[in-house]
Amino acid sequence: MSRGTDMTMRAVTRRGLLGGAALGLGAAAGLAGCAGSGTQGSAAAGSAGASVDAKHQVTIAMGTGNEPAAGFDPCVDWGCGEHVHEPLIQSTLVTTDKDMAFKNDLAVSYECSADNLVWTFEIRNDVKFSDGESLTARDVAFTLNTIRESAQAQADLTMVKEAVATSDTVVEIHLAKPYNALLYTLAVVGIVPEHAYGDGYGEHPIGSGRYLLKQWDKGQQVIFEANPNYYGEAPNIERVTVVFMEEDAALAAVRAGQVDVAYTSATFADQKVSGYGLEAYKSVDSRGISMPVNVAGGTKVEEGDMAFETGNDITCNVEVRRAINLAVDRKAMIEHVLNGYGTAAYSIGDGMPWASPDMKVVRDVKAARKLLEDAGWAKGEDGVYARDGKRASLTLYYSAGDSVRQAMSNEFADQMAELGIEVTPKGAAWDDLYPHQYAGLIMWGWGSNSPADVYELSYSTGTMNYAGYSNPTTDAYLDQALAQPDVEASYPFWQKSEWDGQEGIAPQGAATWVWFANIDHLYWVREGLKVAEQKLQPHGHGWSVVNNVDSWSWQ
């Protein structure tokens, strides 16, 4: 999801780039003594520990928004927060491979009861935390119960009634209702030590994962080193230094040769940097717009002490929502806004095994106009459709600090003008966008490695059902998906929730969203560094790229 903590991509002119580059170069140089490059052979952070050979370390520039405010605490949001990734410092029960198939990490085996309400995991008996204490099933139960009970936790374990250790190596997870998407959550929830967890854990984490946190200079960098007591294969990359920089500063650091990998966006994709190549990693980092399906002025949505207006008198008309989906030129949007670095998006999980092929739509502006005109809409002298005195005029809100969303909003407005729908883009801070989330159009960013997003966006009581869609048939499919005995068996039900041949959220159905593009995650990568094959990256341009950093190598 993309909300207040969303990492923004700054609009930078070429003139601004020169000034920003100078500042960024100074910042990068300031860190050079602390983080050496893999091919330059410079000394790595002396204060972080013993010297590490240059062929076994990397320095990565990430956006400033990727520095975890609460530290490296899975019971808050490390690994399992808004932008999911593997926690590196901590172990997880299971993990996923590049094809999103589950693999054991701490788990030796697991099974679900016949009623799908109890998951039983047997874990390894040879795992130790970095302080030398053994990791047992009690630590697993403690972690899950802590997350379930904490108001700070971002991982959703509300379906868990209780986790119970029945022995040192067996833990039972009791559910309030069947929820087989639990495995996707467990794949990013790091296990913390019951004996050492408390205030300050995020700054001084004790874990059992591939890496140890050796140094954290807040606002600047974090250094990880390989865990010598790790139970799995020893990491090939023994030291990982992550420096936090704005995008223009990251490019300056690349030009100065101070980092080995650096995030960037389509804004800078046409740059050429000697000694580096631009890598584009596919993602499910989608951009799309929610379209309220109900008339304005309906029941308000209450969240805490806030009450949000709902409904929209233009998008409440299904022919408008369907016409918008038909008229969008996704290819042009990707070329104009992303410089070609993206793929067309039709749903929240394109490319995932649970995605429905029926979500795809072929552009047809003529058919879109016919839909509107058959429903009684007629173009006025201004070229905008109107009916019963109401013009097809919409305001589209986007995060003012995000140049890509701004450009995408403007492109969408231009395309809708061709159709005959007036769209006025309006940038605002996230706190000013939220009041419109159930009644207006917002340019959202979504996408995770879990089908749970489909549930939250489409279920009648889903926490992110901004469109206000409510359909008992769709709800039943979603409930059935979660109640299946294994993940693979759930795929057809996720797909039917989107379109079963007669109804669903698909463009030919309720058309609750219009999706534009899955944004490629772009990185400058130093020549000679082989970044291991990436699985589809979720929303959030940052930590997911280092999910498999332990298997990177220098050629």
What positions do the PLM features span?
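Ligand/substrate-recognition segments at binding pockets and active sites
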Residues: 378-448
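Gly/Pro-rich hinge or "lid" segments in bacterial periplasmic/extracellular proteins
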Residues: 97, 101, 178, 184-235, ...
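Detector for C-terminal structural segments
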Residues: 2-3, 19-31, 217, 289, ...
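Ligand-site clamp/hinge motif
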Residues: 228-273, 285, 413, 422-424
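Alpha-helical secondary-structure segments
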Residues: 59, 136-143, 168-170, 174, ...
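Aromatic- and charge-enriched surface segment that lines or borders ligand/interaction sites
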Residues: 108-151, 172, 253, 313-314
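Surface-exposed binding/hinge segments that line
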Residues: 111, 118, 122, 153-196
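N-terminal lobe/hinge region of extracytoplasmic solute-binding protein
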Residues: 61-114, 206
